From Swiss-Prot:
Active site: P2 (schiff-base intermediate with dna), E3 (proton donor), K57 (proton donor), R259 (proton donor)
Gene Ontology molecular-function annotations: 8-oxo-7,8-dihydroguanine DNA N-glycosylase activity; class I DNA-(apurinic or apyrimidinic site) endonuclease activity; damaged DNA binding; zinc ion binding
Gene source species: Yersinia enterocolitica serotype O:8 / biotype 1B (strain NCTC 13174 / 8081)
Protein name: Formamidopyrimidine-DNA glycosylase
Organismal lineage: Bacteria, Pseudomonadati, Pseudomonadota, Gammaproteobacteria, Enterobacterales
Family, as annotated: Belongs to the FPG family.
Amino acid sequence: MPELPEVETSRRGIEPYLVGQTILYAVVRNARLRWPVSDEILALSDQPVLSVQRRAKYLLIELKTGWIIVHLGMSGSLRILPEETEAEKHDHVDLVISNGKILRYTDPRRFGAWLWAKDLETSNVLAHLGPEPLSDEFTAEYLFEKSRNKRTVVKQWLMDNKVVVGVGNIYASESLFTAGILPERAAGSLTETEITQLVATIKAVLLHSIEQGGTTLRDFLQSDGKPGYFAQELQVYGRAGELCRRCGNVIEIAKHGQRSTFFCRHCQH
């Protein structure tokens, strides 16, 4: 599933082609995604694009009359292509742009979403979200206070969007490894020093992944069709049974909240 770095990579890739241009109309070949494509998107006509933003794993395209909210789901990707590019089987939505390009949404598993909001304050999917991990609001003081008396294992807790947004399965495993914290520990057991290290590590891991264009494990592509390269630097995620690059012990796997967690018991405590 595309996580925060992949969504931010997509945002940065499509922004120069959209802002200042006009969306002439939308082509929707299959409206049956996770939720049906909003009627307002089906009816788009000559809408100037004011900005392209991100909140958590949602892309936010600001138009004069409202916002397109895009979630990439499990397998979605966005590409900028010449308008005449023929659609293939899993190409479900195109936004036709005034510069002769299209923004094409491809999603083999159709678990993404294209929604509409008159303003972001009224959007149900954006309500109750925690702070952005790369923002000044996400501090050690904030996370330490949130963690007190929490018995949930720290890996699962970090993936709660009410605590912090965008730290999905890959980056939770990688951040906990880099911070030296066992993912099976209760969130409330972490010391202030460990929380400080964890916050710094989450920010560093996410920033580095964005610099590498995200992580391509299955379907994610950047807006230019190229893969993300952070997968080549993964320390534990997806490496169960392989040797830890730091200590040489075997990487283990466990299930937390029905998600696979990867860790090194020697390097993490």
